[in-house]
């Protein structure tokens, strides 16, 4: 590898997808102050992922159901009086 072309913080970082319980150790410059012990017994800077190829439905082929019950009940609560107004007309 050519010397002097990478930033000072270019190091091995553990990217971890908690929803899929999978992680990858990759060289990166990502800013993080967390660290985690990995399967190989070494401690790496740790960067949590919301989604990755291990958990995203496009890559896994599995469908995830979104929790819409809260939103639907909020909508119904907000507009419950509208049905009676429409029926009166």
UniProtKB/Swiss-Prot annotation:
Gene Ontology molecular function: structural constituent of ribosome
Keyword Heme set for record: no
InterPro entries listed in its UniProt record: Ribosomal_bL28/bL31-like_sf, Ribosomal_bL31, Ribosomal_bL31_B, Ribosomal_bL31_sf
Alphabetized UniProt keyword annotations: Ribonucleoprotein, Ribosomal protein
Matching Pfam families: Ribosomal_L31
Similarity-based family: Belongs to the bacterial ribosomal protein bL31 family. Type B subfamily.
Quaternary organization: Part of the 50S ribosomal subunit.
PANTHER family per UniProt: 50S RIBOSOMAL PROTEIN L31, CHLOROPLASTIC, LARGE RIBOSOMAL SUBUNIT PROTEIN BL31C
Record protein name field: Large ribosomal subunit protein bL31B
């Amino acid at each position: 590898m050519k010397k002097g072309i990478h930033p000072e913080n270019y190091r091995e970082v553990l990217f971890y997808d908690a929803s899929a319980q999978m992680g990858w150790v990759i060289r990166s410059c990502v800013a993080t102050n967390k660290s985690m012990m990995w399967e190989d017994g070494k401690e790496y800077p740790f960067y949590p992922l919301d989604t990755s190829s291990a958990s995203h439905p496009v890559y896994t082929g599995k469908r995830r159901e979104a929790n819409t019950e809260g939103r639907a009940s909020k909508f119904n609560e907000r507009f419950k009086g509208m049905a009676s107004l429409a029926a009166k007309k």
